[in-house]
């Protein structure tokens, strides 16, 4: 299989097991400490400039950081997080007082609800077919984000203990990268740090949701108890719950300790069948405590 090409949904559907165990692995914020630089220097900066929100940049950035980094929404696809970043400040007094008009994002809501894979190819097709100016502006933002990431995010090696963990996984399981990052960026980053050969497929946002990745590649091919997802966001947990598999959390802010625990303890438990139950529940409970659902400027 050509290691530098981008994969398709057919690759996931036709994925053939070589082991009786499957591991899905997220990338940004999980394998690589890239979320902060991507979000703060690329995503959020370009939200402000694309929709001329300079007057309220402080609040836009605060909201975008909450939505993308410091909440239970962390790790979701860029388009729902763009919508959420704006929706969370629509009624914020400081924003209302500024007089700045926020984008309505009516067409974005329809795109998100359409059921198509939420990536640039589907967005570009829809924007071209409809001539919708809002969709065109979102597509420009998304392409500009990709270009900024390609230019900015370099020489960011994986967290400590990742490589040792991937060595263990490759020897005893079939592994794929399961992400909502564009595939092009994933392939580039995994290749840059010589990690590409540890996974059989790199699945990004163009191939569907994380749960769809797992459904296509793992569900029905492996016993549910032999499916594991490693991730740093609640979306990773819900994705693997959708196929009744297990979850190992990479705790935000404690990533290296999480990977060390995986490498020295958790993966062995998963392989010998003692991972599920009290051990997994304790890890998930610890993980869930780290990420709030409501931003501090919204009263519960």
Segment roles from a protein language model:
Residues 10-11, 18-20, 30-184:
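Alpha-helical substrate-recognition element adjacent to the catalytic core
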Residues 25, 141, 251-252:
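Short loop/turn segments at strand-loop or loop-helix junctions that form parts
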Residues 26, 68-80, 277-287:
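A short, hydrophobic secondary-structure junction motif
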Residues 16-18, 222:
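Residue-level detector of transmembrane insertion/anchoring sites
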Residues 4, 25-26, 30:
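Non-catalytic protein-protein interaction scaffold segments in large eukaryotic complex-forming proteins
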Residues 2-3, 154-174, 181-300:
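C-terminal cap/substrate-recognition subdomain and adjoining C-terminal extension
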Residues 4-14:
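A short, compositionally biased domain-edge/stem linker segment
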Residues 21-23, 227:
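The start of beta-strands in P-loop NTPase/AAA+ ATPase cores
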